[in-house]
Amino acid sequence: MPDDEPILEARELGRYVPATNKWLLQHVSLEVAAGERIVVVGPSGSGKTLLLRSLAWLDPLDAGTLYWRGRAVTRHVVPRFRSRVVYLHQRPALIAGTVAENLQYPFQFSVHRSRRFDAAQIEHWLRVLRREPDFLQKSSRDLSGGEAQITALLRAMQLTPDVLLLDEPTAALDPASAQGVEQCVSQWFQEAPQQRTIVWVSHDQEQAARMADRQLVMAAGRIVQGA
């Protein structure tokens, strides 16, 4: 069960586009507890991706405040914050090189040097994902969209963040691979269920039911249910 203290809290978040005189996010308030699994659902254009990017502090806010462990997120805490709150894009960016080089890449940065690359863990996850070990030697340039998503997911999970923000991580995958991703993420969560938190955007209602302790429903830039 999640702790009572929010690990992330959004208070009245808003995103405004002057050119269109439109609020893309409006009055979004949300508490995310440590150890919680949240799935965000809603129609296309409802603000699901923008919500995740805002929770990751990747886009500027025009209203409201984001809090991490009770402290307002500002530019002064961003490197530490982003090492603990990791966002997985629908179209992840990979460096030129092999899958293995992409997985090892984050560990050169000081915010991740307290962690280590765990080859045995990666091999286990590859088996769950029904991928052969030689997948690690594949060039990032030769990866399909689904394989790139898998690579980025493995890279994110091995960093053991406090919060993993997943933007439709199975959208480009076949059903068997999607099932493997669900199993991987569930295993990752269960390794430390009191400390790890997942916020997952999905268009699949059955997937949402499987993966969520709580569902948020978005419409027209607002959370209309579940907050």
Where are each of the predicted segments found?
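A short, flexible loop at the N-terminus of ABC-type nucleotide-binding domains that lies
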Residues: 2-10, 14-27
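Helix-to-loop junction immediately C-terminal to a conserved catalytic motif
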Residues: 56
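Conserved ABC transporter NBD signature motif
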Residues: 64-73, 81
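Conserved catalytic motifs of ABC-family nucleotide-binding domains
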Residues: 91-101, 111-113
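Conserved ABC ATPase "signature" region
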Residues: 116-135
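Conserved ABC ATPase signature
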Residues: 139-143, 147
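ABC ATPase C-loop
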Residues: 156-157
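Catalytic Walker B motif of ABC-type/P-loop ATPase nucleotide-binding domains
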Residues: 164-168
